[in-house]
From Swiss-Prot:
The gene is gatA. One of its GO terms (cellular component) is glutamyl-tRNA(Gln) amidotransferase complex. This is Glutamyl-tRNA(Gln) amidotransferase subunit A. It is an enzyme of class 6 (ligase). Its EC number is 6.3.5.7. One of its GO terms (molecular function) is ATP binding. It holds the Pfam family Amidase. Keywords: ATP-binding, Ligase, Nucleotide-binding, Protein biosynthesis. GO terms for biological process: translation. Belongs to the amidase family. GatA subfamily. It comes from Streptococcus mutans serotype c (strain ATCC 700610 / UA159).
Length: 488
């Protein structure tokens, strides 16, 4: 028996009314994972034993009727720490690493009686946009297994899109939730920087990283963000802004809502058919009563360059801790301490990670710091100012999530610049610390197109309101890939 076509609300009703137990639901989810895993490759680790034990304990205690997430299984990206469960960040460097603590977001899942059924595949240390940079395996697009899943949270996206799980967590540093959500036709949000604790997230770019949910629908996404949000004393960057009920405005109309469409988001470098799809989506929002007007974000064109200086610099610092001494991989080939460091890191890190460490080390070096890192920080401020000016007059900004639909496997893997440019539309949102969601907005040649809605800081409720209004009046989210029983 499978339950993967049922919403979280429907599953909650079944659990509360004892029509199904948490154990039965978890067993069915594990079957769904097993059945589809060879096709898509979403998981690095499936936590069958732990999940079944947890489900049995929840049944013993009883489902909480007031907690919609009680007994619900989900998957978690493999750079989010899970106590005594392999957490590899898809790297040889951490091939055997089992944390001795849970990330705050994981603690919050357990606190609401959610069941983690596995850890999902990703680009190594979240560096990449296709999930082809994993040390362990390749993840394939749920709609077409000859296409990339997107990245870096590719496994979390395909797990939801293929019907292995209903919900998952990913992380987003420059588009790593939104872009794979777009490529796989699911909902994915990068919350405002500081909305969700980063404690226990294996760090890549500390001023950019944020954990967020993937889901089949907008409401389910909001329901999961309700669980993981909030201030955390263990993360000094987590915000003290009060956490509202993110589902509160779902179902309300968007009459009079002002939405900005930046000309840069539908200009050069954007696939013509993707652009047409987004313009059609903008017209649809207008038909629902929103006011959509063209604006300019003039400095967004520098986003990719700024990001690859700042993110790589932060990564080169964060990844210094992986040296073969305390945990993780250690080389067998050494005669002295220098050899341990050099050979461990040379053998343990993949090509893309090494590339970014070198980029970051270069831009932080004494002769180049002012010319690169400092200047990137100044341009980042200009990008933030652009957003601030637009948000003085508008509620939301809309555009495509990615410039193209999912591309062929191995077609950009050897061309890092082409891969970097694929994050053209998502990166500025991270640089400015803003919330941004990707929702299904149409198809091009049988592949999903994502629409990105960007909000003011901590205005996730407004994003969900508009996203839900669009979703309720279209059927893109109802169309499923063949692997999930759909016709596409």
């Amino acid at each position: 028996m499978t339950f993967n076509h049922k919403s979280i609300d429907e599953l909650h009703d079944l659990l509360v009314n004892k029509e199904v137990s948490a154990l039965e639901l978890t067993k069915a989810t594990l079957e769904d994972i097993k059945e589809r895993e060879e096709t898509v490759g979403s998981f690095i680790t499936v936590t069958q034993e732990e999940a079944l034990a947890q489900a049995a304990a929840i049944d013993e205690k009883g489902i909480d009727a007031d907690n919609v997430m009680s007994g619900i299984p989900l998957a978690v990206k493999d750079n989010i720490s899970t106590k005594n469960i392999l957490t590899t960040a898809a790297s040889k460097m951490l091939y055997n690493y089992k944390p001795i603590f849970d990330a705050t977001s994981v603690e919050k899942l357990y606190g609401r009686d959610m069941i983690i059924v596995g850890k999902t595949n990703m680009d190594e240390f979240a560096m990449g946009g296709s999930t082809e940079n994993s040390y362990f395996k390749l993840t394939k697009n749920a709609w077409n297994q000859e296409k990339v899943a997107g990245g870096s949270s590719g496994g979390s996206a395909t797990a939801v899109a293929s019907g292995q799980v209903r919900l998952s967590l990913g992380s987003d540093t420059g588009g790593s939730i939104r872009q794979p959500a777009a490529f796989n036709g699911v909902v994915g949000i990068k919350p405002t920087y500081g909305r969700v604790s980063r404690f226990g997230l294996i760090a890549f770019g500390s001023s950019l990283d944020q954990i967020g949910p993937f889901s089949q629908t907008v409401k389910e996404n909001a329901q999961l963000l309700n669980v993981i949000s909030g201030n955390d004393k263990k993360d000094s960057t987590s915000s003290q802004v009060k956490v509202p009920d993110f589902t509160q405005f779902i179902g309300k109309d968007i009459k009079g809502m002002k939405i900005a469409l930046p000309k840069e988001y539908i200009g050069q470098g954007i696939d013509e058919k993707v652009k047409e799809t987004i313009l059609k989506a903008a017209k649809h929002l207008e038909s629902l009563g929103a006011i959509v007007e063209e604006v300019s974000l003039p400095h967004s064109k520098y986003g990719v360059a700024v990001y690859y200086i700042i993110a790589s610099s932060e990564a080169s610092s964060n990844l210094q801790r992986f040296d073969g001494i305390r945990y993780g991989y250690r080389t067998d080939d050494y005669e002295n301490l220098d050899d341990v460091y050099v050979n461990t890191r040379s053998e343990g890190f993949g090509e893309e990670v090494k590339r970014r460490i070198m980029l970051g080390t270069f831009s932080l070096s004494s002769g180049y710091y002012d010319a690169y890192f400092k200047k990137a920080g100044q341009v980042r401020t200009l990008i933030m100012e652009d957003f601030k000016k637009v948000f003085a007059n508008y509620d939301l900004i809309l555009g495509p999530t990615a410039p193209t639909v999912a591309y062929d496997l191995d077609s950009q893997h050897q061309d890092p610049v082409a891969m970097y440019l694929a994050d053209l539309l998502t990166i500025p949102v991270n640089l400015a610390g803003l919330p941004g969601i990707s929702i299904p907005a149409g198809f091009v040649e049988g592949l999903p197109v994502g629409m990105q809605l960007i909000g003011k800081p901590f205005a996730e409720q407004t994003i969900y309101q508009a996203a839900a209004a669009f979703e309720a009046s279209t059927d893109y989210h109802k169309q499923q890939p063949v692997i999930f029983g759909g016709g596409n």
